[in-house]
Amino acid sequence: MVTETSFCQRNREFAPIQERGNTVSERETIEVDYLIVGAGAMGMAFADTLLTETDATVAIVDRYGRPGGHWTVAYPFVRLHQPSSFYGVNSRELGTDEVDQDGWNAGLHELASSDEILTYFDQVMRKTLLPSGRVSYFPMSHYDGADPARPDVQRCHSLVSGGEFDIRVRRRTVDATYMNVTVPAMCPPKYEVASGVRLITPNQLPALEQQASHYTVVGAGKTGIDACLWLLQHGVDPSGITWIMPRDSWLLDRAQIQPGPESAASDAESFTARIRAVLESRTVEELFQRLEAGGLLLRLSSDVTPTAYRCATVSRTELEQLRRITDIVRHGRVRRIGADTVELGGATVPARPGTLYIDCTADGLEARPVVPMFSGSRITLQTLVPCQQVFSAAFAAHVEATYEDDAEKNRICVAAPHPNTALDWLRSSAHLDDLLLRWFADRGLLEWCDASRLTKYSIGSLPDELRTALFEGLHAERKQLQQLLAHEDQTVAVAVAVAVAAN
C-alpha cells in the first residue's frame, strides 16, 4: 500500500517505516518541487539560493548523518585554504571576517576549521532551511534512482532501518554529488602496503600516542600540504619528514584572494598584472615565468618546474615552512610500500626503519566529464567558476530560478573541468574569461554576483569606463590564452611526430 502525504503535513525529518519481515508494509511517498541529492557544500548552497529566490519545496537526501558532505569525514585539523568569507551559502556568513593575528596565516582573513564548517552547515539546515517549512531532510539515506515505471518518482531508502520511500518530483532532481569529492578516510590507498608497515590517514594523526622515528607523507596535494604543516607545527624536525611528491604544483598566494574593499586596489593590480603577463608571453614557459615573477603563482622549489595545478592555496609563511622539508622524493606515484623499500613509478628507494606513512593520495576532486548542467528533469551541479564550487552551485540555483529555457541556462552555465595539469591554469583562465564575457551581456547576472558573498568578482558595480576596459582585457586575454594553448598542442604534435619517425 502506498500513501501520499502532502508536503505541509509531513514532519521535517522522515518517520521510520514499519517493516514486517522482509516486506515493507507501508511505503511512504512525498511530493516536492525539487529533490537535492547530497547535503554537502554544493547541495546546501543550491538549496539556500533556491529557497531565497523561489517558493519551491525541496527534499534533501544525504548519506551522512549531518549536513556537510565530505567535511563530516575529513581530518580534524583541516581548514579552508581560502578565506571563510567566500565559503558556505549566500544567506549566512561563515566566521566573523576577522584577520588572523598570529600563526602562519597572520595578516590574512580567517580560515574556518572543520568543526566550524560542520557547525555552520548544521545551523544552515536547522535555522534556515528547515524553519522555512519548505524543506524535508533525509539524513542517513541513499538515493536509488528513478522508478523505471514512473520517471517522476525517485526511490530512496534509509541506511539505518532499510525502510524505503519515494519522492515524487514535480520539477527537477538535483545531483549535488557529481563532483565526487573524496578524502583519504573515504578510500584505501591505490598502492600495495606490505604487512607490518605502519600507514595511517591524516584523520589518525591527532590520535598518535607516541612519536614515530620518521614520518613520510605520501601525496603532494592540499591534504599532503596540510599533513606536512601539521607535523611542523607540532615540532617535528624537518629532517624527520620525507615527502613523496609525484608532481610539483603551481600554488596560489592566499594574500591575493582576500575579501573586503581594502583588497580592491591589490585585486586590480593583480588582474592587470595577469592580463599583462598573458599578453606579453609568446610561449607557455614564458607565461609561467611572468606569472611567478609577478607573484601570481608560487612553487615549492625554484629548481623544479611544476607540472600540476589544482588550485591549492598557501600563505607565503606556510610556503617558507614547507621549504624546510628537504627530503622530497620525486619519482612518480607509489606502487608499493614494503618493509625495506618504497617502489615508485620511476624508481625504488630505501625505506627508513620505523617510518610512519601518512596517506594523502585521495583524489579530492577527481576529473569528471563535463555534462550539460540543465537537462530535462535533472540538474547536475558542477563547477562554473574554476575552484569555486559553492559559488557555482548558488549561481546555478539563481539561473534555475530566473530563466525558463534550458538552452539559455546552459549557455550561461558552462561547467569547467577541475584543473589538474599546469596547462589547466590556462584553460581555467580562458574558461573564466569566457564566462565573464557571457555575463557582461546580462546586467542582472552581474548585479547578482556583486550581491553574493561567495565570490570576489564584483563587476556590475564598476563604472562604465572601467567595465569597458575590463571587457576589452578579457577578450584579449582569452584570445592569447587560446593561441598559447594551440601553440603548445602544435609543439607536442611535432615532438611526437619526430619521435615516431626516429623509431
Label each region the model flagged.
Residues 32-59, 224-232:
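N-terminal Rossmann-like FAD-binding beta1-loop-alpha1 element of flavoenzymes
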Residues 37, 166-181, 216-218, 353-363:
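Short hydrophobic core segments
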Residues 63-120, 244-301:
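Glycine-rich active-site loop/strand segments that organize a redox cofactor
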Residues 107, 113, 117-120, 172-235, ...:
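Glycine-rich dinucleotide-binding loop and its adjacent helix/turn
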